[in-house]
């Protein structure tokens, strides 16, 4: 009989160092720490097997399909320099393993089950290569960077935002008042915090109404287009779309979603709604550190960012890089480019394991936020460039004279830095001097 039952090593089937990757493969780079006594080849093969067609034993139904066509393959393993017992395992997945247009299915396949496999003590997905034939099946950002600039009529500089604090406890009217002060002072956007949904102290409908009033008042007074990220995240997809619909009816230009806690299915639904109804979509990454904080286990933020670009979003939070280590800066800039650019070359020093070609998929604006203030402005302008949103929460609202003067300070600092850069001055060296001159 042709079928031979029993358990055999994964590497006999799934470790294929002679394999030449195809243009139709999705490629993954896993950082793995094998269990003591498990060879790296076996651990890499186990990862490839468990995230594609394999199971722990041979099954007779394997004979009813073409394993060679469908199996994932671990095609290369390299030790991580400076780390004991850590390896990068490269795995190629045939395109037929994935449903078109579903980030949910892609992540369920690649990382859904394999992180509990016995052979690996720890596992981290560092990067994915998404081929154009697959990325073309996704909606991508509802509008993208250029369309957003045209809608807002704002060019040649980063955009400015501010998260309204305290995040919970204000009534809707005072919340709207804080929004108005910031926008009147010169910010482009204000923002609901990620956990502001519809709590007893401030129901979503009341908040939306007072914020819309603040928006239009600030627009009339400044002559600029203003926005507030109205958080449409809700307990059900239906409720989320209901909130986005109300925002559209009020004439708001942008809504917001917590894409990891809300889930990729909900996010893609909202992205379709936003594209069909002319709403921009701001994405918050709440819960990301649960997944990406550990250096040897989980998923790197660049994978979550790639997944978001496919699922749909016009802005996404991307950390700040200010005051971090040099290496961190390069890695952060690497995935910022993955969000914005059409074509990104492989560059291991920036954490980019594969060349990524997004073809014509629109870009996402990276949002720098978290503990930044006016004195960081020269560094932020230099690092992030024009296509970004700089978001100052306490850096605006913490101004001793209040919200509007805080917003003015940010806008003046930004305009000064952009002008200095355009004049060819060195922001890194002269930054503090530029800010001092501007504040007179």
UniProtKB/Swiss-Prot annotation:
The main location is plastid
Quaternary structure, per UniProt, is: Heterohexadecamer of 8 large chains and 8 small chains; disulfide-linked. The disulfide link is formed within the large subunit homodimers.
A Gene Ontology biological process term: reductive pentose-phosphate cycle
User: GO cellular component annotations, sorted alphabetically?
Assistant: chloroplast
What species was this sequence derived from?
Pteris vittata
> Positions of the site: Transition state stabilizer?
324
Q: Where does Mg(2+) bind?
A: 191, 193-194
Note on cofactor: Binds 1 Mg(2+) ion per subunit.
UniProt KW keywords: Calvin cycle, Carbon dioxide fixation, Chloroplast, Disulfide bond, Lyase, Magnesium, Metal-binding, Methylation, Monooxygenase, Oxidoreductase, Photorespiration, Photosynthesis, Plastid
Catalytic machinery residues:
165, 284
**PROSITE patterns named in the record:** RUBISCO_LARGE
- List the NCBIfam families: PRK04208.1
Q: Where in the cell is it found?
A: Plastid, Chloroplast
Role this protein plays: RuBisCO catalyzes two reactions: the carboxylation of D-ribulose 1,5-bisphosphate, the primary event in carbon dioxide fixation, as well as the oxidative fragmentation of the pentose substrate in the photorespiration process. Both reactions occur simultaneously and in competition at the same active site.
What is known about its processing and modification?
A: The disulfide bond which can form in the large chain dimeric partners within the hexadecamer appears to be associated with oxidative stress and protein turnover.
Name of the protein this chain belongs to:
Ribulose bisphosphate carboxylase large chain
């Amino acid at each position: 009989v042709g079928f031979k039952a029993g358990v055999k090593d994964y590497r006999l089937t799934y470790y294929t160092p002679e394999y030449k990757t195809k243009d139709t493969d999705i490629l993954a780079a896993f950082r793995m720490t094998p269990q003591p006594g498990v060879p790296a080849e076996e651990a890499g093969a186990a990862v490839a097997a468990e995230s594609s067609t394999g199971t722990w034993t041979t099954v007779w139904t394997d004979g009813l399909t073409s394993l060679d066509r469908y199996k994932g393959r671990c095609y290369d393993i390299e030790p991580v320099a400076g780390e004991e017992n850590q390896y990068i395992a490269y795995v190629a997945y045939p395109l037929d393993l994935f449903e078109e247009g579903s980030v949910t299915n892609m992540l369920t396949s690649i990382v859904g089950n394999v992180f509990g496999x016995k052979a690996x003590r720890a596992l981290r997905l560092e990067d994915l290569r998404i081929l154009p034939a697959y990325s073309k099946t996704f909606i991508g950002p509802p509008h993208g960077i250029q369309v957003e600039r045209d809608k807002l009529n704002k060019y040649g500089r980063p955009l400015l935002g501010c998260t309204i604090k305290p995040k919970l406890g204000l009534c809707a009217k005072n919340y709207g008042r804080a929004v108005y002060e910031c926008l009147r002072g010169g910010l482009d956007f204000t923002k609901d915090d990620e956990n502001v949904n519809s709590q007893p102290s401030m129901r979503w409908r009341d908040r939306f109404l007072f914020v819309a009033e603040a928006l239009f008042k600030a627009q009339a007074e400044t002559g600029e287009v203003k926005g507030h990220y109205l958080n449409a995240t809700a307990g059900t997809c239906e409720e989320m779309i209901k909130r986005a619909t109300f925002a559209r009816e009020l004439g708001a230009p942008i809504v917001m979603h917590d894409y990891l806690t809300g889930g990729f299915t909900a996010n893609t639904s909202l992205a379709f709604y936003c594209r069909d109804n002319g709403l921009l979509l701001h994405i918050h990454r709440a819960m990301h550190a649960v997944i990406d904080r550990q250096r040897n286990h989980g998923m790197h933020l660049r994978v979550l960012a790639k997944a978001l670009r496919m699922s749909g979003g016009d802005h996404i939070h991307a950390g700040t890089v200010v005051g971090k280590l040099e290496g961190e800066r390069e890695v952060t800039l690497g995935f910022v480019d993955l969000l914005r650019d059409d074509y990104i070359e492989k560059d291991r020093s920036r954490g980019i394991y594969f060349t990524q070609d997004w073809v014509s998929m629109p870009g996402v604006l990276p949002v720098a936020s978290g503990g930044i203030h006016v004195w960081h402005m020269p560094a932020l302008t230099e690092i992030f460039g024009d296509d970004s949103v700089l978001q100052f929460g306490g850096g605006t609202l913490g101004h001793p004279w209040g919200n509007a003067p805080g917003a003015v300070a940010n806008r003046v600092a930004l305009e000064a830095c952009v002008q200095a850069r355009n004049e060819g001055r060195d922001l890194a060296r002269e930054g503090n001097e530029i800010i001092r001159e501007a504040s007179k």
